[in-house]
Amino acid sequence: MTGLLSQAILLVDGYNVIGAWPELIQLRDTQGLDIARSQLAETLANYSAYKGFETLLVFDAYGQPQTHRSEKFTQHLSIHYTSFGQTADSYIEISCAKFRNDIRKFEKRLIVATSDRTQRLTVVGYGAEWMSATQLGSDVNLSVQKVKHRQKPQKRSKQRFLSKSLNPETQAKLAKLRLNLMD
């Protein structure tokens, strides 16, 4: 976990989310698991940057004989692949147990995103917050809408001068100021 100044640490069970979001299920089934993983990483990178979260996206080793590895995807997102034989669930549980004794718990929230009921009970027992994969998807979509709304261009006045876009009362006050008629 990095030392970013974030308001929360978000742990995401990657395959659980892929299996819960309709658009990722479709990608997985039509284009493959790698494409679905990449899309999830891109989506979470944007979401994490918007929310100011430090996000750890966790994937099981998926039967691959490998040791744990992690890669920094962006400033806000790192991707963790568990060791052979370790599940994302156990990786997340260990992270929650460590966080429970970490001084950062007084400064940051720890949120776990998974729809696994047993996992939910365990992480809440460690003091973490929980959200389902569906809730995460809804929050991601809401964040995307907020960003789009912010980026909408302001309606520009068709008038050549700024004063023409002002209401009549303000225009009158400006005219008086210009003519030194104000008290």
Residue map of PLM features:
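Nuclease catalytic cores that cleave nucleic-acid phosphodiester bonds
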Residues: 2-9, 16-183
